[in-house]
């Protein structure tokens, strides 16, 4: 996120509007979509040091440092916990063609597994409406990846729900 730069000063407001309503306008045209926004962040110092002097959202550009903006995005992936790409991560064997994965992910957008939460868990009153929507959507998306046939267990839902609450 640190490398994001806005030439158009309305960019952050457009993103906030989209994250709140699922639509945004440019000129006379209104555009609707159903994708969530997830950001990947990296930090240039240790987590311990950053937390003592600032916060984990500090890498965001100044234009985005806004509680309304932070309340609206669905996840912040801690990039500092993701290993950097190395040659041993690649193979000369068979692999997954990304086109197939993209088509599968597009097809799975037709389904929601958010009701899986209600089968075993109850979200508390500490979540506001935006948080509840984000947690339900993130849990649903994760379940689509780990249990694509819709046959999930209480434990798989719990793991996805805990991750969704953390992000």
How would you name each of these model-derived features?
Residues 1, 30-53, 75-78:
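Structural recognition of the conserved hydrophobic beta-strand(s) that form the central parallel beta-sheet
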Residues 1-18, 42-52, 68-69:
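Conserved AAA+/SF3 P-loop NTPase catalytic/coupling segment centered on the Walker-B
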